[in-house]
């Protein structure tokens, strides 16, 4: 009976203990939202990591629960990059969690070895980091540049010998980037390559060993107490190699080789990092004897794979997003011709400050950080409040670089997309803000030491590849990623061909100038654009609109395009064309029309919408606003045919200069009925306006407030003249520009210094292959200088192959693109931009033929 009592008491005690333990776990962070299981166990974290898609699970959790989410009984994940300084301060006090304990390489005879990146003890970390930190400064790294140059030469030799002339047989470009990164680090560290490039394979199984290490520690890091049983256990080590053992064997081999002559008092002339490590240890009694081993291990583990990761990210995205590839190649060619950039051995001095290369590197670091689980820290005494959430002392807290780097409040709604331009044209403060929001290299006291080495290698490699080879990606759908702490990519297959060398100076005069960066704010929102051709035709006198005159081009019969812009159930019209009863316009306007032009087939846009027999179903009653590009008769249509609830939007100065209208003002060119009973909104491009921004050289206004549709200040042709820019696709972005009457012939815009005459059109005699055929005539513009500036601004837009430019009276587009009720959102996929850009040369050919 006594035994039964003891058993019962013991059972009750165990139950009470477990209940208290579970309650403490739950209550410890009870105010932090998260999935139910996370309050009691870390097993779901293990599953997330084991799946290889932990970053996706993390993102879903934050989407559901907010910026602070409980991932485990004592672990909280934060997604807001604005909290980086609080969690990763420059001062001591936020040690790394036991997640990093599992990353210490282990051997049975020497135990677990701390290194700079995995040490939890902050005093030990300081003792390991401080002696070698100067070696990783850019000043010192540049002294080792010749080691990288040697490896670049071997890479070129191997690519030329193995893959050129191979009948476009695909090869694993991703693996060769990794071979280059490892052999570069080998030369930097040991003055010798591992042999990856020469052999074209994983030497000594190092790559496989590192990936095995990552897959093991990523899981163990979620339940670090289990590591002592499964990995750092002398008994287990009898049956399998512990994590990091293979890499340590390579490290020990090279160190022993380097120490041998030193033990014989032989002088070594090696200038690599291992020599510097050994010199530091030999000259500083406070440095632990095993420190060079730890430093070298870090170089191999963290310094090579992560660099290769960024290289793969850059090349994949450049090859998929060919517009960014072209832009970077243009920048490199410009630097080659003007600054002496070498194709085979570019110096750091020549590549360090190339703006678009820099933007591509930053975008790769942002989009695909090499390490992709939360960087865990332990909250010190006194606790921490982040995201309005209090975390008591002892709580494990961390931010994943994947979450911080894709924060949409910081990087824009297109934070998931490749867009290097987001880094260009920023103020110093905005650029710093974005850079400080990146967690790729860590932050605070534990920022990655090898950052400068990685940047130097990357900025030297990418120009070499792009200047020497035409590279095409093969089956991009096979490109995959797997997250095992290290965010690995596979499947980057490509074919290469030798790129023809442009002789320096031979084509500079014909070489296009890079247009200014447009700095269109990122957005994931788009509009549908439908171009309405009402069938109305106007006869234009060229001398009123452009100069010089061509004897055979005395008259141009032009259409009048209008635009239906839709986002969801919201619909606006940009311009209305010529009203059907145009003879009811003010007498002075009617007289001008009859003396200078003829109008064929005028139609009201409201009638076109209301008679549409397609399934579109957008009627005049659905239009929330009419936007006038300007107040001339061939654009204003008849607003009175729309409900009074339809707003009229006009450019700056229109309201005061055009109303009262006719008949109140006999000299007016607009009618009172245009606005009678209707709300008129006159937009302003003043920077004090909330939605006012700058796009390229244009002052702009975000019309819907979501980055899908902008009005641009296209001044000069008349008072209040505006254009519009619509985002019609994302991933990648493409746009439609509606130019109104900024000019009336594409020859006013093309060729340009950004867009020279194509070779197939050079049989037409031109004064210059990089200057427009025509210039604006000064006859009609209300402000000729402003009109010329607007044309220059449009030329900048026109130079981008993701902007489709439509002038209101461009006859070359008729029959060469889709019109209402179809959208033109797929204009780029259908090739409208390339197919129509130079069709205006037909006018010139016809004009010259007519003079013969």
From Swiss-Prot:
Its cofactor is heme. It catalyses: 5-methylorsellinate + reduced [NADPH--hemoprotein reductase] + O2 = 4,6-dihydroxy-2-(hydroxymethyl)-3-methylbenzoate + oxidized [NADPH--hemoprotein reductase] + H2O + H(+); 4,6-dihydroxy-2-(hydroxymethyl)-3-methylbenzoate + H(+) = 5,7-dihydroxy-4-methylphthalide + H2O. Its main location: endoplasmic reticulum. It is an enzyme of class 1 (oxidoreductase). SMART domains: Lactamase_B. SUPFAM superfamilies: Cytochrome P450, Metallo-hydrolase/oxidoreductase. It is found in: Endoplasmic reticulum membrane. One of its GO terms (biological process) is mycophenolic acid biosynthetic process. Keywords: Endoplasmic reticulum, Heme, Iron, Membrane, Metal-binding, Monooxygenase, Oxidoreductase, Transmembrane, Transmembrane helix. The keyword Iron applies. The keyword Transmembrane helix applies. Belongs to the cytochrome P450 family. PANTHER family: CYTOCHROME P450, CYTOCHROME P450 MONOOXYGENASE PKFB. Cytochrome P450 monooxygenase; part of the gene cluster that mediates the biosynthesis of mycophenolic acid (MPA), the first isolated antibiotic natural product in the world obtained from a culture of Penicillium brevicompactum in 1893. MpaDE is an endoplasmic reticulum-bound enzyme that catalyzes the conversion of 5-methylorsellinic acid (5MOA) into the phthalide compound 5,7-dihydroxy-4,6-dimethylphthalide (DHMP). This is Cytochrome P450 monooxygenase mpaDE. The lineage of its organism: Eukaryota, Fungi, Dikarya, Ascomycota, Pezizomycotina.
């Amino acid at each position: 009976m006594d035994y039964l009592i003891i058993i019962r008491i013991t059972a009750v005690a165990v139950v009470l203990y477990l209940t208290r333990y579970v309650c403490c776990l739950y209550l410890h962070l009870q105010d932090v939202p998260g999935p139910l299981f996370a309050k009691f166990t870390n097993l779901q974290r293990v599953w997330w990591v084991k799946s290889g898609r932990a970053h996706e699970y993390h993102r879903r959790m934050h989407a559901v629960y907010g910026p602070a989410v409980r991932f485990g009984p004592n672990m909280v994940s934060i997604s807001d990059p604005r909290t980086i300084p609080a969690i990763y301060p420059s001062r001591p006090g936020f040690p790394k969690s036991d997640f990093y304990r599992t990353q210490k390489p282990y051997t049975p005879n020497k135990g677990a070895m701390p290194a700079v990146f995995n040490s939890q003890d902050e005093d030990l970390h300081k003792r390991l980091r401080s002696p070698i930190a100067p070696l990783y400064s850019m000043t010192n790294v540049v002294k080792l540049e010749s080691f990288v140059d040697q490896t670049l030469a071997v890479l070129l030799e191997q690519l030329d010998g193995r893959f050129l002339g191979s009948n476009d047989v695909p090869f694993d470009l991703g693996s060769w980037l990794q071979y280059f990164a490892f052999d570069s680090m080998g030369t930097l560290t040991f003055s010798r390559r591992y042999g990856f490039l020469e052999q074209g394979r994983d030497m000594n199984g190092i790559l496989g060993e590192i990936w095995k290490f990552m897959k093991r520690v990523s899981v163990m890091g979620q339940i670090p107490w289990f590591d002592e049983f499964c990995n750092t256990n002398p008994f287990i080590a009898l049956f399998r190699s512990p994590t990091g053992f293979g890499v340590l064997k390579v490290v020990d081999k090279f160190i022993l080789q380097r120490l041998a002559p030193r033990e014989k008092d032989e002088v070594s002339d090696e200038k690599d990092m291992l020599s510097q490590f050994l010199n530091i240890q030999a000259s500083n009694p406070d440095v632990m004897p095993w420190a060079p081993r730890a430093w070298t291990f870090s170089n191999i583990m963290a310094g090579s794979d992560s660099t290769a990761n960024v290289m793969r990210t850059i090349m994949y995205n450049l090859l998929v997003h060919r517009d960014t590839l072209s832009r970077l190649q243009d920048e490199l060619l410009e630097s080659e011709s003007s600054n002496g950039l070498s194709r085979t051995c570019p110096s750091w001095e020549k590549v360090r400050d190339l703006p678009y290369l820099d933007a591509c590197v930053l975008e790769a670091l942002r989009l695909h950080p090499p390490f992709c689980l939360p960087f865990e820290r332990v909250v010190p005494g006194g606790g921490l409040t982040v995201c309005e959430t209090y975390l008591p002392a002892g709580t494990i807290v961390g931010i994943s670089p994947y979450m911080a780097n894709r924060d949409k409040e910081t990087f824009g709604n297109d934070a998931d997309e490749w867009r290097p331009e987001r880094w260009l044209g920023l103020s110093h403060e905005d650029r710093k803000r974005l850079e400080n929001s990146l967690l790729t290299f860590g932050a605070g006291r534990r920022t990655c030491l090898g950052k400068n080495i990685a940047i130097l290698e990357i900025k030297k490699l990418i120009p070499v590849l792009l200047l020497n080879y035409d590279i095409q990606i093969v089956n991009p759908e096979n490109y995959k990623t797997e997250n095992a702490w290290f965010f690995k990519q596979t499947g980057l297959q490509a074919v290469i061909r030798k790129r023809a060398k442009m002789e320096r100076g031979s084509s500079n005069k014909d070489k296009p100038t890079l247009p200014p960066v447009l700095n269109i704010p990122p957005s994931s929102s788009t509009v549908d654009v439908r171009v309405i051709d009402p069938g109305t035709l106007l006869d234009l006198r060229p001398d009123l609109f452009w100069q010089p005159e061509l004897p055979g081009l005395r008259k141009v019969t032009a259409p009048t395009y209008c635009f239906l812009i839709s986002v969801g159930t919201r619909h606006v019209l940009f311009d209305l064309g010529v009203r059907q009863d145009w003879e009811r316009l003010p007498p002075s306007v009617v007289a001008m029309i009859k003396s200078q032009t003829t109008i064929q087939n005028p139609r009201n846009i409201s009638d076109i919408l209301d008679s549409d027999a397609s399934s579109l179903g957008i009627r005049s009653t659905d239009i929330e606003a009419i936007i006038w590009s300007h107040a001339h008769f061939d654009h204003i249509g008849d607003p009175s045919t729309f409900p009074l609830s339809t707003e009229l939007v006009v450019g700056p100065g229109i309201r005061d200069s055009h109303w009262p209208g006719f008949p109140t003002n006999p000299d007016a060119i607009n009618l009172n009925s245009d606005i009678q009973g209707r709300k008129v909104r006159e937009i302003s491009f003043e920077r004090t306006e909330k939605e006012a921004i700058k796009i390229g050289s244009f002052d702009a206004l975000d019309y819907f407030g979501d980055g899908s549709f902008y009005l641009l200040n296209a001044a000069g042709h008349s008072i209040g003249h505006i254009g519009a820019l619509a985002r019609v696709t994302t991933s990648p972005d493409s746009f439609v520009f509606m130019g109104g009457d900024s000019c009336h012939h594409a020859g006013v815009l093309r060729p340009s210094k950004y867009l020279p005459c194509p070779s197939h059109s050079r049989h037409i005699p031109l004064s210059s292959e990089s200057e427009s055929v025509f210039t604006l005539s000064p006859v009609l513009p209300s402000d000729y200088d402003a009109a010329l500036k607007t044309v220059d601004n449009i030329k900048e837009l026109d130079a981008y192959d993701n902007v489709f430019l439509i002038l209101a009276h461009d006859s070359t587009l008729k029959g060469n693109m889709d019109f209402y009720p179809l959208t033109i959102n797929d204009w780029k996929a259908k090739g409208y931009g390339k197919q129509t850009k130079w069709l205006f040369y037909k006018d010139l050919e016809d004009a010259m033929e007519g003079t013969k």
